[in-house]
Amino acid sequence: MVQISQIGAVLAVCSTLTVAAPTKGKARFNVPQVAVPMKAVHHPAVAYARALHKFGMKVPKAVSDAARGSVPTTPTKDDEQYVTQVTVGQGKLNLDLDTGSGDLWVFSTETPKDQSQGHNLYMPTSKSKRLDGYSWEITYGDMSSAGGDVFLDTVSIGNVTASSQAVESAKKVSDQFAKDKATDGLMGLSFSVLNTVQPKPQTTFFDTVLKQLEKPLFTCTLKHGQPGSYDFGYIDDSKHSGEIAYTNVDNSQGWWGFTAESYSIGGGSNSTHSFHGAQHRGTRGSSIDGIADTGTTLMLLSDDVVQEYYGKVQGAKNDQQQGGWVFPCDAKLPDFTLSISGYNAVVPGKFMNYQAVGSVCFGGLQSVGSSGGVPNIFGDVFLKSQFVVWDTEGPRIGFAPQA
Protein backbone atom coordinates (compact mmCIF):
# COMPACT_ATOMS: atom_id res chain seq x y z
CA MET A 1 0.00 0.00 0.00
CA VAL A 2 1.13 3.50 -0.75
CA GLN A 3 0.70 6.32 1.71
CA ILE A 4 -1.06 9.50 0.71
CA SER A 5 2.05 11.70 0.53
CA GLN A 6 3.67 9.54 -2.17
CA ILE A 7 1.55 10.88 -5.00
CA GLY A 8 3.82 12.48 -7.58
CA ALA A 9 6.95 12.10 -5.48
CA VAL A 10 10.15 11.14 -7.24
CA LEU A 11 12.84 10.80 -4.60
CA ALA A 12 16.61 10.45 -4.64
CA VAL A 13 17.20 6.91 -3.42
CA CYS A 14 20.02 5.89 -1.14
CA SER A 15 22.49 3.53 -2.80
CA THR A 16 24.74 2.72 0.15
CA LEU A 17 23.16 -0.56 1.25
CA THR A 18 25.42 -3.57 1.02
CA VAL A 19 24.29 -6.98 -0.13
CA ALA A 20 25.44 -10.47 0.73
CA ALA A 21 26.40 -12.14 -2.53
CA PRO A 22 26.26 -15.92 -2.56
CA THR A 23 26.69 -17.07 -6.19
CA LYS A 24 26.30 -13.48 -7.35
CA GLY A 25 24.15 -13.15 -10.43
CA LYS A 26 22.94 -16.76 -10.31
CA ALA A 27 20.31 -16.71 -7.58
CA ARG A 28 16.69 -17.66 -8.12
CA PHE A 29 14.05 -18.52 -5.57
CA ASN A 30 10.40 -19.33 -5.15
CA VAL A 31 8.23 -17.75 -2.46
CA PRO A 32 4.97 -19.61 -1.88
CA GLN A 33 2.19 -17.79 -0.09
CA VAL A 34 0.84 -19.40 3.06
CA ALA A 35 -2.75 -19.44 4.26
CA VAL A 36 -3.39 -17.75 7.60
CA PRO A 37 -6.84 -18.03 9.23
CA MET A 38 -8.54 -14.64 9.38
CA LYS A 39 -9.66 -13.48 12.81
CA ALA A 40 -11.89 -10.74 11.46
CA VAL A 41 -13.38 -9.69 8.14
CA HIS A 42 -13.81 -5.96 7.51
CA HIS A 43 -16.53 -4.42 5.40
CA PRO A 44 -15.31 -4.31 1.76
CA ALA A 45 -15.74 -0.53 1.74
CA VAL A 46 -12.57 -0.43 3.88
CA ALA A 47 -10.57 -1.96 1.01
CA TYR A 48 -12.26 0.42 -1.43
CA ALA A 49 -11.52 3.53 0.65
CA ARG A 50 -7.92 2.45 1.19
CA ALA A 51 -7.39 1.93 -2.54
CA LEU A 52 -8.77 5.37 -3.43
CA HIS A 53 -6.79 7.21 -0.77
CA LYS A 54 -3.65 5.22 -1.57
CA PHE A 55 -3.38 6.94 -4.93
CA GLY A 56 -4.56 10.37 -3.80
CA MET A 57 -8.13 10.11 -5.04
CA LYS A 58 -11.17 11.62 -3.38
CA VAL A 59 -13.10 9.13 -1.28
CA PRO A 60 -16.86 9.64 -1.74
CA LYS A 61 -18.74 10.30 1.49
CA ALA A 62 -20.81 7.13 1.11
CA VAL A 63 -17.64 5.03 0.84
CA SER A 64 -16.02 6.80 3.78
CA ASP A 65 -19.13 6.43 5.93
CA ALA A 66 -19.45 2.72 5.12
CA ALA A 67 -15.75 2.13 5.88
CA ARG A 68 -15.69 4.06 9.15
CA GLY A 69 -19.01 2.69 10.34
CA SER A 70 -18.07 -0.91 9.70
CA VAL A 71 -16.98 -3.36 12.36
CA PRO A 72 -15.03 -6.59 11.93
CA THR A 73 -17.16 -9.70 11.63
CA THR A 74 -16.32 -13.26 12.57
CA PRO A 75 -15.25 -15.17 9.45
CA THR A 76 -16.24 -18.71 8.59
CA LYS A 77 -13.77 -21.52 9.18
CA ASP A 78 -12.85 -21.46 5.50
CA ASP A 79 -11.89 -17.77 5.34
CA GLU A 80 -8.15 -17.31 4.92
CA GLN A 81 -5.69 -14.58 4.05
CA TYR A 82 -2.59 -15.29 1.99
CA VAL A 83 0.77 -13.95 3.12
CA THR A 84 4.47 -14.59 2.51
CA GLN A 85 6.95 -15.74 5.13
CA VAL A 86 10.12 -13.65 5.26
CA THR A 87 13.07 -13.95 7.65
CA VAL A 88 13.77 -10.52 9.13
CA GLY A 89 16.73 -10.48 11.50
CA GLN A 90 16.42 -13.62 13.61
CA GLY A 91 12.71 -14.34 13.13
CA LYS A 92 10.12 -15.24 10.52
CA LEU A 93 7.31 -12.79 9.82
CA ASN A 94 4.18 -13.03 7.67
CA LEU A 95 4.31 -10.10 5.25
CA ASP A 96 2.18 -8.74 2.43
CA LEU A 97 4.18 -8.31 -0.78
CA ASP A 98 3.03 -5.03 -2.32
CA THR A 99 4.10 -3.76 -5.75
CA GLY A 100 2.44 -0.42 -4.98
CA SER A 101 4.79 0.69 -2.19
CA GLY A 102 8.51 0.90 -1.45
CA ASP A 103 8.69 0.26 2.30
CA LEU A 104 9.55 -2.81 4.34
CA TRP A 105 7.88 -2.16 7.69
CA VAL A 106 7.19 -4.65 10.47
CA PHE A 107 5.72 -5.12 13.92
CA SER A 108 8.59 -5.29 16.39
CA THR A 109 9.53 -5.45 20.04
CA GLU A 110 9.37 -1.64 19.89
CA THR A 111 5.64 -1.80 19.12
CA PRO A 112 3.53 -1.25 22.27
CA LYS A 113 2.29 -4.55 23.70
CA ASP A 114 -1.37 -3.60 23.43
CA GLN A 115 -0.82 -3.07 19.68
CA SER A 116 1.49 -6.01 18.96
CA GLN A 117 -0.35 -8.81 20.77
CA GLY A 118 -0.92 -11.78 18.48
CA HIS A 119 1.73 -10.72 15.95
CA ASN A 120 5.13 -12.18 15.18
CA LEU A 121 7.70 -9.53 16.07
CA TYR A 122 10.96 -8.32 14.61
CA MET A 123 13.54 -8.24 17.40
CA PRO A 124 16.54 -5.94 16.84
CA THR A 125 19.75 -7.42 18.26
CA SER A 126 23.30 -6.28 18.82
CA LYS A 127 23.92 -7.12 15.15
CA SER A 128 21.19 -4.73 14.03
CA LYS A 129 22.29 -1.20 13.18
CA ARG A 130 19.93 1.60 14.15
CA LEU A 131 19.97 4.53 11.72
CA ASP A 132 20.08 7.46 14.14
CA GLY A 133 17.82 10.31 13.12
CA TYR A 134 15.92 8.23 10.55
CA SER A 135 12.17 7.69 10.74
CA TRP A 136 9.11 6.72 8.74
CA GLU A 137 5.39 7.44 8.93
CA ILE A 138 2.59 6.11 6.75
CA THR A 139 -1.13 6.91 6.67
CA TYR A 140 -3.43 4.82 4.52
CA GLY A 141 -6.79 5.52 2.93
CA ASP A 142 -8.94 4.15 5.75
CA MET A 143 -6.90 6.41 8.07
CA SER A 144 -4.94 3.47 9.44
CA SER A 145 -1.37 4.47 10.18
CA ALA A 146 2.02 3.28 11.35
CA GLY A 147 5.40 4.83 12.08
CA GLY A 148 8.69 4.32 13.82
CA ASP A 149 12.44 4.14 13.35
CA VAL A 150 14.81 2.32 11.01
CA PHE A 151 17.39 -0.45 11.36
CA LEU A 152 19.78 -2.11 8.93
CA ASP A 153 19.51 -5.88 9.32
CA THR A 154 19.56 -9.15 7.40
CA VAL A 155 16.45 -10.02 5.42
CA SER A 156 16.16 -13.38 3.67
CA ILE A 157 13.73 -14.97 1.27
CA GLY A 158 14.58 -18.37 -0.12
CA ASN A 159 18.33 -18.59 -0.74
CA VAL A 160 18.88 -14.85 -1.11
CA THR A 161 19.90 -12.56 1.74
CA ALA A 162 20.26 -8.79 1.94
CA SER A 163 22.81 -8.34 4.71
CA SER A 164 22.11 -4.65 5.29
CA GLN A 165 18.48 -4.05 4.38
CA ALA A 166 16.49 -1.13 5.72
CA VAL A 167 13.87 -2.52 8.12
CA GLU A 168 11.26 -0.04 9.30
CA SER A 169 10.37 -0.92 12.89
CA ALA A 170 6.89 0.11 14.04
CA LYS A 171 6.80 2.08 17.29
CA LYS A 172 3.10 2.77 16.80
CA VAL A 173 0.29 1.29 14.73
CA SER A 174 -3.40 2.13 14.52
CA ASP A 175 -6.15 -0.23 15.63
CA GLN A 176 -6.76 -1.39 12.07
CA PHE A 177 -3.27 -2.88 11.85
CA ALA A 178 -3.19 -4.10 15.45
CA LYS A 179 -6.38 -6.13 14.90
CA ASP A 180 -5.18 -7.68 11.64
CA LYS A 181 -3.40 -10.68 13.15
CA ALA A 182 -2.78 -12.36 9.78
CA THR A 183 0.04 -10.02 8.77
CA ASP A 184 3.10 -8.76 10.61
CA GLY A 185 3.99 -6.01 8.17
CA LEU A 186 4.55 -5.22 4.53
CA MET A 187 7.33 -5.66 1.96
CA GLY A 188 7.17 -3.10 -0.85
CA LEU A 189 8.13 -4.16 -4.39
CA SER A 190 7.61 -0.88 -6.22
CA PHE A 191 10.55 1.10 -7.57
CA SER A 192 12.65 2.44 -4.71
CA VAL A 193 11.70 6.07 -5.37
CA LEU A 194 8.53 5.41 -3.37
CA ASN A 195 10.39 4.57 -0.16
CA THR A 196 9.27 6.92 2.64
CA VAL A 197 12.21 6.83 5.05
CA GLN A 198 13.45 10.27 6.06
CA PRO A 199 15.83 12.05 5.78
CA LYS A 200 17.17 9.66 3.09
CA PRO A 201 14.98 7.06 1.33
CA GLN A 202 16.21 3.47 1.31
CA THR A 203 16.15 0.76 -1.36
CA THR A 204 13.52 -1.96 -1.51
CA PHE A 205 14.51 -5.55 -0.80
CA PHE A 206 14.17 -6.36 -4.51
CA ASP A 207 16.50 -3.53 -5.54
CA THR A 208 18.95 -4.46 -2.79
CA VAL A 209 19.32 -8.06 -4.01
CA LEU A 210 18.90 -7.32 -7.72
CA LYS A 211 22.53 -8.04 -8.67
CA GLN A 212 22.36 -11.43 -6.99
CA LEU A 213 19.53 -12.61 -9.21
CA GLU A 214 19.90 -14.66 -12.37
CA LYS A 215 17.54 -12.25 -14.12
CA PRO A 216 16.46 -8.77 -12.89
CA LEU A 217 12.81 -9.70 -12.53
CA PHE A 218 10.20 -11.40 -10.44
CA THR A 219 6.90 -13.05 -11.30
CA CYS A 220 3.67 -13.54 -9.42
CA THR A 221 1.06 -16.23 -9.80
CA LEU A 222 -1.70 -15.09 -7.48
CA LYS A 223 -4.71 -17.36 -7.14
CA HIS A 224 -8.43 -16.91 -6.57
CA GLY A 225 -9.37 -18.56 -3.29
CA GLN A 226 -6.04 -20.30 -2.68
CA PRO A 227 -2.37 -19.45 -2.02
CA GLY A 228 -0.27 -18.28 -4.95
CA SER A 229 3.47 -17.72 -5.31
CA TYR A 230 6.21 -15.28 -6.26
CA ASP A 231 9.37 -16.28 -8.15
CA PHE A 232 12.46 -14.07 -8.09
CA GLY A 233 15.23 -14.13 -10.72
CA TYR A 234 13.59 -16.49 -13.22
CA ILE A 235 10.44 -17.35 -15.13
CA ASP A 236 8.86 -20.72 -14.37
CA ASP A 237 7.30 -21.66 -17.70
CA SER A 238 5.22 -24.37 -16.04
CA LYS A 239 3.10 -21.65 -14.42
CA HIS A 240 1.78 -20.09 -17.62
CA SER A 241 0.39 -21.19 -20.96
CA GLY A 242 1.20 -19.61 -24.30
CA GLU A 243 3.56 -16.74 -24.98
CA ILE A 244 4.10 -13.92 -22.50
CA ALA A 245 2.89 -10.59 -23.89
CA TYR A 246 5.05 -7.67 -22.75
CA THR A 247 4.26 -3.98 -22.63
CA ASN A 248 6.36 -1.01 -21.55
CA VAL A 249 6.21 0.22 -17.96
CA ASP A 250 5.95 3.88 -17.02
CA ASN A 251 7.81 4.09 -13.69
CA SER A 252 8.06 7.89 -13.60
CA GLN A 253 5.98 7.93 -10.40
CA GLY A 254 7.64 4.83 -8.95
CA TRP A 255 4.79 2.46 -9.84
CA TRP A 256 4.46 -0.39 -12.31
CA GLY A 257 2.33 1.61 -14.75
CA PHE A 258 1.20 0.29 -18.13
CA THR A 259 -1.36 0.94 -20.86
CA ALA A 260 -4.45 -1.04 -21.85
CA GLU A 261 -5.94 -0.21 -25.23
CA SER A 262 -9.50 -1.50 -24.85
CA TYR A 263 -11.87 -3.72 -22.92
CA SER A 264 -14.82 -6.00 -23.50
CA ILE A 265 -17.61 -7.28 -21.28
CA GLY A 266 -18.89 -10.80 -21.79
CA GLY A 267 -18.52 -12.00 -25.38
CA GLY A 268 -19.76 -11.33 -28.85
CA SER A 269 -18.55 -9.34 -31.82
CA ASN A 270 -20.10 -6.09 -30.58
CA SER A 271 -18.54 -6.06 -27.13
CA THR A 272 -15.18 -4.35 -27.69
CA HIS A 273 -14.72 -0.78 -26.54
CA SER A 274 -12.01 1.79 -26.24
CA PHE A 275 -11.66 3.45 -22.86
CA HIS A 276 -12.49 6.85 -24.35
CA GLY A 277 -16.23 7.39 -24.65
CA ALA A 278 -17.04 3.93 -23.37
CA GLN A 279 -20.74 4.50 -23.90
CA HIS A 280 -20.23 4.23 -27.68
CA ARG A 281 -20.07 0.60 -28.75
CA GLY A 282 -17.16 -0.35 -30.95
CA THR A 283 -15.53 3.08 -30.92
CA ARG A 284 -11.76 3.24 -30.85
CA GLY A 285 -10.05 6.16 -29.20
CA SER A 286 -7.82 6.92 -26.28
CA SER A 287 -6.22 4.11 -24.30
CA ILE A 288 -6.09 3.96 -20.51
CA ASP A 289 -3.10 4.19 -18.21
CA GLY A 290 -3.18 2.04 -15.10
CA ILE A 291 -1.07 0.71 -12.25
CA ALA A 292 -0.48 -2.98 -11.50
CA ASP A 293 -0.68 -3.25 -7.72
CA THR A 294 -0.62 -6.45 -5.66
CA GLY A 295 -1.31 -4.31 -2.58
CA THR A 296 -4.75 -3.21 -3.78
CA THR A 297 -7.50 -5.80 -3.48
CA LEU A 298 -9.99 -4.37 -5.98
CA MET A 299 -9.89 -3.30 -9.62
CA LEU A 300 -10.76 0.40 -9.99
CA LEU A 301 -11.76 1.85 -13.38
CA SER A 302 -13.64 4.90 -14.64
CA ASP A 303 -17.32 5.48 -13.89
CA ASP A 304 -18.54 4.78 -17.42
CA VAL A 305 -16.78 1.42 -17.66
CA VAL A 306 -17.99 0.33 -14.22
CA GLN A 307 -21.56 1.42 -14.95
CA GLU A 308 -21.55 -0.46 -18.23
CA TYR A 309 -20.29 -3.64 -16.55
CA TYR A 310 -22.90 -3.63 -13.81
CA GLY A 311 -25.55 -2.69 -16.35
CA LYS A 312 -25.16 -6.28 -17.52
CA VAL A 313 -25.64 -7.71 -14.00
CA GLN A 314 -29.26 -8.23 -13.00
CA GLY A 315 -30.10 -6.50 -9.72
CA ALA A 316 -26.79 -4.60 -9.47
CA LYS A 317 -26.85 -1.09 -8.00
CA ASN A 318 -24.51 1.54 -6.63
CA ASP A 319 -25.56 1.28 -2.98
CA GLN A 320 -24.76 4.38 -0.92
CA GLN A 321 -25.23 2.51 2.35
CA GLN A 322 -22.75 -0.20 1.38
CA GLY A 323 -20.37 2.31 -0.22
CA GLY A 324 -20.11 0.78 -3.70
CA TRP A 325 -21.57 -1.44 -6.36
CA VAL A 326 -23.40 -4.50 -5.01
CA PHE A 327 -25.53 -7.24 -6.55
CA PRO A 328 -27.47 -10.37 -5.56
CA CYS A 329 -24.94 -13.01 -4.58
CA ASP A 330 -26.42 -15.50 -7.04
CA ALA A 331 -26.24 -13.05 -9.96
CA LYS A 332 -24.51 -14.19 -13.15
CA LEU A 333 -21.40 -12.05 -13.64
CA PRO A 334 -19.92 -11.57 -17.13
CA ASP A 335 -16.21 -11.92 -17.84
CA PHE A 336 -14.18 -8.73 -18.22
CA THR A 337 -11.37 -8.61 -20.79
CA LEU A 338 -8.54 -6.09 -21.11
CA SER A 339 -6.56 -5.73 -24.34
CA ILE A 340 -2.89 -5.08 -23.55
CA SER A 341 -0.47 -4.82 -26.49
CA GLY A 342 -2.70 -7.15 -28.47
CA TYR A 343 -3.07 -9.68 -25.65
CA ASN A 344 -6.54 -10.31 -24.21
CA ALA A 345 -6.36 -10.69 -20.42
CA VAL A 346 -9.61 -12.26 -19.24
CA VAL A 347 -10.93 -11.74 -15.71
CA PRO A 348 -13.53 -14.47 -15.05
CA GLY A 349 -16.87 -13.14 -13.88
CA LYS A 350 -16.68 -15.08 -10.61
CA PHE A 351 -13.63 -12.98 -9.62
CA MET A 352 -15.90 -9.91 -9.58
CA ASN A 353 -17.76 -11.27 -6.54
CA TYR A 354 -15.50 -9.83 -3.86
CA GLN A 355 -17.34 -10.32 -0.56
CA ALA A 356 -20.81 -10.84 0.87
CA VAL A 357 -22.24 -7.96 2.90
CA GLY A 358 -25.51 -8.96 4.45
CA SER A 359 -27.91 -10.16 1.77
CA VAL A 360 -25.88 -8.83 -1.19
CA CYS A 361 -22.34 -9.13 -2.53
CA PHE A 362 -19.80 -6.31 -3.00
CA GLY A 363 -18.23 -6.03 -6.45
CA GLY A 364 -14.54 -6.55 -7.12
CA LEU A 365 -14.77 -3.83 -9.78
CA GLN A 366 -15.45 -0.34 -8.41
CA SER A 367 -15.22 3.22 -9.70
CA VAL A 368 -12.01 5.20 -9.61
CA GLY A 369 -14.08 8.36 -10.08
CA SER A 370 -14.88 10.59 -13.02
CA SER A 371 -12.29 13.36 -12.59
CA GLY A 372 -9.38 13.46 -15.02
CA GLY A 373 -5.81 12.63 -14.12
CA VAL A 374 -6.53 9.84 -11.63
CA PRO A 375 -4.86 6.48 -12.23
CA ASN A 376 -6.77 3.31 -12.92
CA ILE A 377 -5.80 0.50 -10.57
CA PHE A 378 -5.37 -3.09 -11.69
CA GLY A 379 -5.39 -4.77 -8.28
CA ASP A 380 -5.66 -8.38 -7.17
CA VAL A 381 -9.05 -8.97 -8.79
CA PHE A 382 -7.26 -8.51 -12.13
CA LEU A 383 -3.84 -9.90 -11.21
CA LYS A 384 -5.23 -13.19 -9.88
CA SER A 385 -6.42 -13.95 -13.40
CA GLN A 386 -2.92 -13.70 -14.88
CA PHE A 387 0.67 -14.90 -14.74
CA VAL A 388 2.58 -11.62 -14.39
CA VAL A 389 6.25 -10.79 -15.05
CA TRP A 390 7.71 -7.68 -13.41
CA ASP A 391 10.92 -6.98 -15.34
CA THR A 392 13.28 -4.10 -14.50
CA GLU A 393 14.93 -4.31 -17.92
CA GLY A 394 12.98 -1.86 -20.02
CA PRO A 395 11.26 -1.72 -17.60
CA ARG A 396 8.38 -3.83 -18.80
CA ILE A 397 5.55 -5.99 -17.52
CA GLY A 398 4.36 -9.24 -19.06
CA PHE A 399 1.06 -11.13 -18.99
CA ALA A 400 0.02 -14.65 -19.89
CA PRO A 401 -2.78 -17.03 -18.91
CA GLN A 402 -2.04 -19.09 -15.82
CA ALA A 403 -1.35 -22.75 -16.55
Curated annotation (Swiss-Prot):
InterPro entries: Aspartic_peptidase_A1, Aspartic_peptidase_AS, Aspergillopepsin-like_cat_dom, PEPTIDASE_A1, Peptidase_aspartic_dom_sf. One of its GO terms (cellular component) is extracellular region. Glycans are attached at residues 159, 270. GO terms for molecular function: aspartic-type endopeptidase activity. GO terms for biological process: proteolysis. Residues 1-20 form the signal peptide. It is found in: Secreted. The keyword Repressor does not apply. Its main location: secreted. It catalyses: Hydrolysis of proteins with broad specificity. Generally favors hydrophobic residues in P1 and P1', but also accepts Lys in P1, which leads to activation of trypsinogen. Does not clot milk. Residues 82-400 form the Peptidase A1 domain. Its EC number is 3.4.23.18. Keywords: Aspartyl protease, Disulfide bond, Glycoprotein, Hydrolase, Protease, Secreted, Signal, Virulence, Zymogen. The active site is at 98, 293. Residues 21-67 form a propeptide. It is an enzyme of class 3 (hydrolase). It comes from the Eukaryota. Pfam families: Asp (PF00026). Disulfide bonds join 329-361. Secreted aspartic endopeptidase that allows assimilation of proteinaceous substrates. Can catalyze hydrolysis of the major structural proteins of basement membrane, elastin, collagen, and laminin. Thought to play a significant role in virulence. PANTHER family: ASPERGILLOPEPSIN-1-RELATED, BETA-SITE APP-CLEAVING ENZYME, ISOFORM A-RELATED. Belongs to the peptidase A1 family. This is Aspartic protease PEP1. The lineage of its organism: Eukaryota, Fungi, Dikarya, Ascomycota, Pezizomycotina.
